[in-house]
Structure formats: C-alpha cells, structure tokens
Amino acid sequence: MGKLLKPSKEIGIVGYGAYVPMYRIRNEEIGRVWGVSNFPIEEKAVPGLDEDAVTIGIEAARNALKRAKIDPREIRAIWFGSESKPYAVKPSATIIAEAIGATPDLEAADFEFACKAGTEALQAAIGFVASGMAKYAMAIGADTAQGRPADHLEFTAGAGGAAFIVGEKSSETLAYFEGSYSYVTDTPDFWRRQHEHYPRHGNRFTGEPAYFHHVITAAKTLMDELGLTPADFDYAVFHQPNVKFPLTAAKILGIPKEKVLPGLLTGKIGNTYSGATMVGISAVLDIAKPGDRILWVSFGSGAGSDAFSIVVQDAIEEKRDLAPKVEDYVKRRKVIDYALYAKARRKYIL
C-alpha cells in the first residue's frame, strides 16, 4: 500500500470562504513599546472586542455557503480546527452549525493540532464524504492567536480563518483533490499547557527539526506519489508563521517565489495559525484559472504537515465572485495603537 491518501471517489471543493478581522496593528508600533527595531512582518490582524475564533469561523462558513449555493442542512459534518477556541469544554463546531442553519442532523466536533487543525479537519471531511456517509462536509480553520507581551510571537500572531465545503467531484465543484499525504512526528517545538495563557516554544526545534523537516517531507512525498514535479504546479501555499519560512521552503523544493507570493499573506495579516494555509488557498482560488494545479502544505507544531494537490475547475469562474474575496478583507483595515490592541486582546489584568 502506498503512502498517498486517495479516496475511492473523487472529492472536490464545492464552496470556500475566508474572513479576516478589520483591525490592524503595525509591527513598528509593537516595537515602539518594547524597544525592538527588527520586524518579521509589516502588520497583523487583530480581532475586535466582539470577535473570537468562533465568530471568524461563522463568517468564513457563511462565505463558503454563498459560493457553494447549497442548503446548509445538506451538510452532514462540520469540523472546526483551532487552538484558540473560546471554550475549554464545549464544542465550538455546534455554535457554528447552529449559526449557519445546519443543525440538527449532522456530525460536529472540534479538532486540535496546533496550526494544522483546519487541514486535519479537511482530511477527515474528504474521507467522510468519500465513504458515502455524507453528501457534503465542512472543514474550518480559524484562530485568534496569542503571543506573550514582548515575545517574538506577539509580532506575528494574527487572526483570521477560512472554511471549505467538500462534496463529490462534479461540474459544481470549483476544484478537486488529486490526492493528499500526512506526515507527523512527536517534535516538541511549541506548546501551551493547561491553565497557561500564552504558548511556549522550544527555539532549537522550531526551524529545521519542525517546520522544514515536516513541510519538505510532506511536499516531496506527495509529489513523488502523484508522479509530479514542482514545475507541474502553478501555485504553492505553505504554512506561513512568517514571510521567510514559506519562501525558504519553496526555494528548497525548487518552486519560484512568484508561485508562492499570491497566497502568502502573513506580512499583511499575521500568522492566522489554523487558518494560515486555508486563507492562503482562498486567496489563490480568488485569482486562479481552470486547469491550474495548486500545492497546499500545512504545518502544525507538535508536529506534522498535511499536503494536498488540487486542480481548479471551470466552476471557479462563476463562484468566486459570490462572496467577499480575501483581498477585500486585507484592504478593509483600521490601524490601532498598542493600547487598543492590548485591550482587544485582553492583555490588561483588571
């Protein structure tokens, strides 16, 4: 048996949608407060006082439904991936399902795997639909990531998310999955223990042993199993904790940065964790042409990567304009100072 994950039925994306909060804080403003002058990105998205990972997931799910043009009650599973769920004990997926009118006849659960929780949910959704147990399933990745004040994560931890509705490949699917591959090991590069507010990171594990080892291995294995080369892909979206890592991964794989930049959004909205590659793929689908092939590789600390190859179909031309595009959310911005940012992120202890 090969390593490729390929269901017996061809599965495609029926609808997709993204959402990014309006507020932004520039890295130079964070640096002004903490006396730092070297910045990994330009600015990051900040959730409003009435926003969290669930509200982001709801907005993304609604946009996906607009493009899918289906009755939400036809969705038989909603799986929500996040590491910043508002409840420690209570599923967020049920809130989203209720909000979009999908209840009560469906599966609903929350997934966790650091920044690849959303693509982990997507793998499950693909298998669930391919098994014949559901006509449609929805996978969501959304986060309002936190970084300890003055920690380097504070400069990049952003907010945003995306949702994908999958179904059997047809003339109504806007892209289909050629295959996927998942690769995981026990690598302690990043964690947050119970009752701790901010995550910790093992610096010596962060780069080569964690991100690059898993992303490169997953991408190469997927291409080898499908008999494809980097030249066969028109776009590539990698997990983007910063701007440097995905561009370096692309260079190692022999993929020109021009194929990566359209889906590389961290510099403008920060690292959206579970939403990172899903928002990036949404941005690429907003501009892709029928026949384009896209390499999609997520990464989650702890550690693992999911790699997908998707091919864009004709329906993209009709569906992409049915909901706001990622660029619309990127341009919809209001810059705030550190005081308002700290208030919005509840960093003040009263």
Swiss-Prot record:
InterPro entries attached to this UniProt entry: ACP_syn_III_C, HMG_CoA_Synthase, Thiolase-like
CDD domains cross-referenced by the UniProt entry: init_cond_enzymes (cd00827)
Binding site for CoA: R204, K244
HAMAP family attached to this UniProt entry: HMG_CoA_synth_arch (MF_01409)
NCBIfam families: HMG_CoA_syn_Arc, PRK04262.1
Oligomeric form and interacting partners: Interacts with acetoacetyl-CoA thiolase that catalyzes the precedent step in the pathway and with a DUF35 protein. The acetoacetyl-CoA thiolase/HMG-CoA synthase complex channels the intermediate via a fused CoA-binding site, which allows for efficient coupling of the endergonic thiolase reaction with the exergonic HMGCS reaction.
Protein name: Hydroxymethylglutaryl-CoA synthase
Organism: Pyrococcus abyssi (strain GE5 / Orsay)
Gene this chain is encoded by: acaA
